[in-house]
């Protein structure tokens, strides 16, 4: 096995998928930034959820908003619903794992808030339940998926934003999700701070 060749293919494949995603996602990402800014400027917050690598992405995004991304600015309200082990295990034990995010959305979400729902397959049952709870709370939904968008893609309304990565491999989808989250953070900072192109 030629590891150098295999590694090179990974980089090339990742770059190709990112360029393909640029065509599909640039405008929807800009729309998602505007929705998030609208919520944050009206004392709203962003609740983020996902499983596995997507849980890490939810935490990464919330940390960038609460702390900072690349520029100094005031903290922004964002909560990753993946971090409170007592709450997560209590809900999973007493009810069902499909409810671990939706119960938190019902407790913490308010009209005008935004749910950032991350699922590479678009079929994660607990993320789907979180979207249903967000509907009840009159929240907008920004969904990051891959493949064909799965069940989540079919659930979204006109007021929501679907950021579906045009790829099948989970690793490639996750790589584009991370870049997308960084684009969201950068867009939020630029609109909040009035930063011109650099």
From Swiss-Prot:
HAMAP family the record matches: GmhA
Tagged with keyword Metal-binding: yes
Gene coding for it: gmhA
Family in the record: Belongs to the SIS family. GmhA subfamily.
Cofactor(s) recorded in Swiss-Prot or TrEMBL: Zn(2+)
Single GO MF annotation: D-sedoheptulose 7-phosphate isomerase activity
Binding site for substrate: 51-53, 64, 93-94, 119-121, 124, 174
Listed name of the protein: Phosphoheptose isomerase
Domain of life according to the entry: Bacteria
């Amino acid at each position: 096995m030629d590891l150098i060749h295999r590694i090179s293919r990974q980089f090339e494949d990742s770059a190709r998928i990112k360029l393909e995603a640029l065509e599909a996602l640039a405008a929807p990402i800009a729309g998602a930034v505007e929705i998030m800014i609208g919520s944050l400027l009206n004392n709203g917050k962003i609740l983020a959820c996902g499983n596995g690598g997507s849980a890490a992405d939810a935490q990464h995004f919330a940390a960038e908003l609460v702390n900072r991304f690349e520029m100094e600015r005031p903290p922004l309200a964002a909560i990753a619903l993946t971090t409170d082990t007592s709450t997560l295990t209590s809900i999973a034990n007493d009810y069902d794992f499909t409810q671990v995010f939706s119960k938190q959305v019902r407790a913490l979400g308010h009209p005008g808030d935004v749910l950032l729902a991350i699922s590479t397959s678009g079929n994660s049952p607990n993320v789907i339940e979180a979207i249903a709870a967000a509907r009840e709370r009159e929240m907008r939904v920004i969904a990051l998926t891959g493949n064909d968008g799965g069940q989540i893609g079919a659930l979204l309304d006109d007021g929501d934003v679907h950021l579906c990565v045009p790829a099948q491999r989970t690793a490639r989808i996750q790589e584009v999700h991370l870049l997308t989250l960084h684009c969201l953070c950068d867009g939020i900072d630029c609109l909040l701070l009035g930063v011109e192109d650099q």
